[in-house]
């Protein structure tokens, strides 16, 4: 059974071996996320090499995402996890040290120290650990814990009521982007985006490294990101609803409503949307998710999210492969009751997705024709990815087989809802249509006499302007018997 909603897996110590990565792929992983808040270029380089070798061996559109560290406040390295209890105190310092309970822990960046005030609430590790500032000095802050937990290396930290303007991109981020371009990665997730100028500045950096069109996903994690959402969505290529930091920066009870708003607004703008953070969090430790987590994933799918993301579940959890299998099962079951026609009602007058006027005229009508004809799939040839992205935003019941000669587009489409990318060297319509049908049969999407709707370009045309309703048999004949018994 196919799954239209895509799965993003964060890769970490629990999964960064060839054997585990192949198991994640078999379980349903579509995108491998590398979190550059952790690790080194050397360690990420090893993982990237394994992923590239794997996707070449298996001939699958597995995308690789670089997630930037961004301008966040974060703890430094600790010698070993520091166990804390209510009433315990810990010193945060500006100098770089290997942290411990006795010596304290480094707090990055050091420019925040002058802005910290006593009695300010402190949230660590997505709010799991709470504390309060009891002593604030120029290069040192002392906090007192209000609940128990473990302080680990590189965990996020949020200080309420702090007013400091952090730069959008750090020197580390720029070095990481350069590394990502050199490694020919497929997607960039930009942390703590506040406005469209942040996206523009990152594009200029990518352009200076020779990759101006590298897709950028804007992570919405603070009140400015929410406030400027519409302009950010137009500037970016995709949106990530980063619920962890969002639930710290804003009231946690606001997150569900914002999630629904951003999922719909992303589609209307023509951008894919990723729902992230704590989706199957309990599976970090337990073999089964909670009922609430299953409902959370299902509701994100009902909202029309393009992809759902696993973080600690696959990076460091005890059951990473089972977490992906569970996520895929939830997707498949939920999509049985997905209201596909409800997503036809789309106010896309302000869409930022640039497609030809021909496709705008025939795209939605084509989906309706295919459904009325009981077709089993839509096949579309694309050089830029625009046509399948345009069709995907309407969330059609029919799988979209996207045939492309562009390797960057092939991997980039891995995150698009309902799109199944296929790489080709052919531009002849008869040939690539034949190849797409073979692909559909091999993937279990199509069979012998299924009807298909093909979007293509007419002779001498540069843009998609032609619809053809045909059958798999006619497209494959006379070689169908060699493929389907």
Swiss-Prot record:
Site (Transition state stabilizer): 219
SUPFAM superfamilies: Phosphoenolpyruvate/pyruvate domain, PK beta-barrel domain-like, PK C-terminal domain-like
Involved pathway(s): Carbohydrate degradation; glycolysis; pyruvate from D-glyceraldehyde 3-phosphate: step 5/5
EC number, UniProt record: 2.7.1.40
Record: residues binding K(+): 35, 37, 67-68
Alphabetical UniProt keywords: ATP-binding, Glycolysis, Kinase, Magnesium, Metal-binding, Nucleotide-binding, Potassium, Pyruvate, Transferase
Record has Ribonucleoprotein as a keyword: no
Residues the entry annotates as binding Mg(2+): 221, 245
Any Pfam family the entry gives: PK
Binding-site residues for ATP, renumbered to this chain: 35-38, 74, 155
Keyword Transmembrane annotated: no
InterPro entries reported in the protein's UniProt record: Pyr_Knase, Pyrv/PenolPyrv_kinase-like_dom, Pyrv_kinase-like_dom_sf, Pyrv_Knase-like_insert_dom_sf, Pyrv_Knase_brl, Pyrv_Knase_C, Pyrv_Knase_C_sf, Pyrv_Knase_insert_dom_sf
Cofactor(s) listed in the protein's UniProt record: Mg(2+); K(+)
GO molecular function (one): kinase activity
Binding site for substrate: 33, 244-245, 277
Catalytic activity: pyruvate + ATP = phosphoenolpyruvate + ADP + H(+)
Signal peptide range in chain numbering: none
Subunit structure of this chain's protein: Homotetramer.
Protein name: Pyruvate kinase
Annotated source species: Chlamydia trachomatis serovar L2 (strain ATCC VR-902B / DSM 19102 / 434/Bu)
Taxon lineage: Bacteria, Pseudomonadati, Chlamydiota, Chlamydiia, Chlamydiales
Gene this chain is encoded by: pyk
């Amino acid at each position: 059974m196919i799954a239209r909603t895509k799965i993003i897996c964060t890769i970490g110590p629990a999964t960064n071996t060839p054997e585990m990565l192949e198991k994640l792929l078999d379980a349903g992983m579509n995108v491998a996320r590398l979190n550059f808040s952790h690790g080194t270029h050397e360690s990420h380089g090893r993982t990237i090499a394994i992923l590239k070798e794997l996707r070449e061996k298996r001939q699958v559109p597995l995308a690789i995402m670089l997630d930037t560290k961004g301008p966040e406040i974060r703890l430094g390295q600790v010698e070993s996890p520091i166990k804390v209890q209510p009433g315990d105190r810990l010193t945060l310092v500006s100098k770089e040290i290997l942290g411990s309970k006795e010596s304290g822990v480094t707090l990055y960046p050091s420019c925040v120290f002058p802005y910290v005030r006593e009695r300010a609430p402190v949230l660590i590790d997505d709010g799991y650990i709470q504390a309060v500032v009891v002593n604030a000095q120029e290069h040192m802050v002392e906090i007192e814990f209000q609940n128990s937990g473990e302080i680990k290396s590189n965990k996020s930290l949020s200080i309420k009521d702090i007013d400091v303007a952090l730069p959008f991109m750090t020197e580390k981020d720029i070095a990481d982007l350069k590394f990502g371009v050199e490694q020919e990665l497929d997607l960039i997730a930009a942390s703590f985006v506040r406005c469209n100028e942040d996206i523009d500045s990152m594009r200029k950096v990518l352009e200076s490294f020779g990759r101006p069109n590298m897709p950028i996903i804007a992570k919405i994690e603070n009140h400015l990101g929410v406030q400027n959402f519409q302009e950010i969505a137009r500037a970016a290529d995709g949106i990530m609803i980063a619920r962890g930091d969002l639930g710290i920066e804003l009231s946690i009870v606001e997150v569900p409503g914002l999630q629904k708003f951003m999922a719909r607004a992303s589609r209307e703008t023509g951008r894919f949307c990723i729902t992230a953070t704590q989706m199957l969090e309990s599976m970090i430790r337990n073999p089964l998710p909670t009922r609430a987590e299953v409902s959370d994933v299902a509701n994100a799918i009902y909202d029309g999210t393009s992809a759902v993301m696993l973080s600690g579940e696959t990076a460091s959890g005890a059951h990473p492969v089972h977490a992906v299998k569970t996520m895929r099962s939830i997707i498949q079951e939920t999509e049985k009751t997905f209201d596909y026609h409800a997503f036809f009602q789309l106010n896309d007058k302000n869409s930022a997705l640039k497609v030809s006027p021909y496709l705008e005229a025939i795209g939605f009508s084509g989906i309706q024709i295919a459904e009325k004809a009981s077709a089993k799939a839509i096949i579309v040839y694309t050089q830029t990815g625009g046509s399948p992205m345009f069709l995907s935003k309407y969330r059609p019941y029919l799988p979209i087989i996207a045939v492309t000669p562009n390797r960057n587009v092939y991997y980039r489409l891995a995150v698009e809802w309902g799109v199944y990318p296929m790489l080709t060297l052919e531009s002849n319509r008869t040939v690539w249509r034949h190849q797409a049908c073979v692909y559909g049969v091999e993937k279990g999407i199509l069979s012998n006499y299924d009807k298909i709707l093909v979007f293509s370009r007419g002779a001498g045309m540069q843009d998609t302007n032609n619809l053809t309703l045909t059958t798999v048999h006619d497209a494959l004949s006379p070689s169908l018997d060699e493929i389907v018994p």
